[in-house]
Amino acid sequence: MMKRGFWFVVGLVVTIILLPSLVLSNSIGEQGIYADRLRAEPYNLLGRKIAIGQVEIGRPAQFGYDKVAAWQPPYKLAGVFFRDQIAKPNTYLDNHAAMVATVMVSDDKKIPGVAPKARLYSGAVGSLRRGGQPEECLASQNIARQNSGDVRAINFSFGESLQRDQRQEAKLDGQALLTQCVDWSSRVDDVLYVIAGNQGKGGIPIPTDHFNGITTAYTAKREGKFTKVDFANISALPVGIGRSLIKREINDGSRRSINLVAPGNKIELYDLKGKLNTVSGTSFAAPHITASVALLQEYGDQQINQKNPHWSLDSRRHQVMKAVMLNAADKIKDTGDGLLLGMRRTVLTKDQKTWLESDAYKDPKIPLDMQMGTGHLNTFRAYQQFSNGQWSATESIAAIGWDYGTVTANDYQDYALEKPLKANSFVSITLAWDRLVELIDTNRNNLYDIDESFRDRGLNNLDVYLLPAQEDNNTKYTCASLSDSDSLEHIFCPIPTSGKYKIRVQYRQQVNEKEQAFALAWWTVTE
């Protein structure tokens, strides 16, 4: 935690260790997320013309606008705000927000950001003594509506406590106002929210129980590479001494919180005064994901502008970004034969377990590992997943690809793979769709206003199967993901025999609308 003047920063989802900098971090390179490959030739992706957002208690400084110091921050901001207004100079400045911004858009040679040319809009909520979830929702909505309403991802490196929630016996059930706000905004503004996971002694878990974005835990280095879920993450089953805390501060029911992990231990970043500090926390894992969206979206927009085949405006959908990044995550290091999809690292939980030892690998009703979700962010692999383009259910599909489609209640969409799959190779499939949250818009201005609320219309139940090409009986699947509580399904399994296969998206149970939009990403190895 940090204080700056009168600043009362109880909302930050972070454990920060301020140490002298000894070794510069390489979290965006091959020790971390492999984004440096995309920044270099021939890709040359820097996030140009892509807008991303940041919502925090405070905000970073804007050089030439805020006269806090002679030092020029290593980033440029597209806009700075206090809630839904332009921020006044020298107000709501915060070291934590500055360091999070550095991860995303720093143009410094020593401490480069993931997407230095992205347009970052930063919004401050202000002192929590004078605000709470309504003000946080207002600030989020304001950031989502910047850049003419075209903001591709928003970073949340802060959170709210259950103790401050106005509900009686509040729990992480997706019903907090801020959580509903995030899921509503993700749908109506079509923006991917990336939420820093709960950690340390807890106390700041809202909105980690959202459905429509990505929640992250953070990793530490082992043998020079970010591979291990750090102990400070609250992302384990509720057992042992901390059982009562952990049980209260993870999702209610069977739905798991963590979707993806990213580097967050001992990251070197600049504060407001230009001092280099070593920091740790989920707060610094989340912006690795948020800024990676900017790199992918720059590439996607290039393909759209060039009118390349297998590209459409669907590439901008938040569900597509979620499915692509989760599906391309590292789990188990490939030995070089490609059977493990070219993965670059073996990721370990706190207790030294791999994804192949998880209940998510063994049980089709559990799509996510409790601690690592689908695995570790690999931005270059996400590019490989994304760059193969969109393939619809009306055509034979490539070995790697994605789609944005719809399915009707009690029906299914089949995606037939064009080429036979290789025996003993692994397949990765991710299906993502939204919970339906609606604004109770009392003044009918199509905006959230303080004192307004939301209506949760629930989550339709979709499943995903990998079936032999000629098989129509779902019970005879090769692999499946069949959760009844999640807004995503994920398959990672070996192919038993060579042959032709298809992916089936099944609309199992209708809760709200008859037609459900979804994003699907797949990665296979063909003969």
Segments (PLM) and residue ranges:
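C-terminal edge strands of extracellular/lumenal beta-sandwich accessory domains
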Residues: R317-H318, K322, N327, Q413-L417, ...
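Active-site neighborhood of phospho(di)ester-bond hydrolases with catalytic His/Asp-centered motifs
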Residues: N155-S157, Y193-N198, T216
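Gly/Ser-rich catalytic serine loop of serine hydrolases
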Residues: P89-A101, G174, K275-A291
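Subtilisin-like serine protease catalytic core
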Residues: N26-I28, R37-E135, S148-A153, Q163-D165, ...
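Secreted peptidase-domain scaffold signal
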Residues: G342-N460, L520-E527
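Hydrolase catalytic cores
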Residues: V125, A262-L356
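N-terminal signal peptide c-region/cleavage motif recognized by signal peptidases
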Residues: T15-P20
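Extracellular S/T/G-rich loop segment that most often corresponds to the catalytic His/Ser-adjacent loop
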Residues: I206-E298
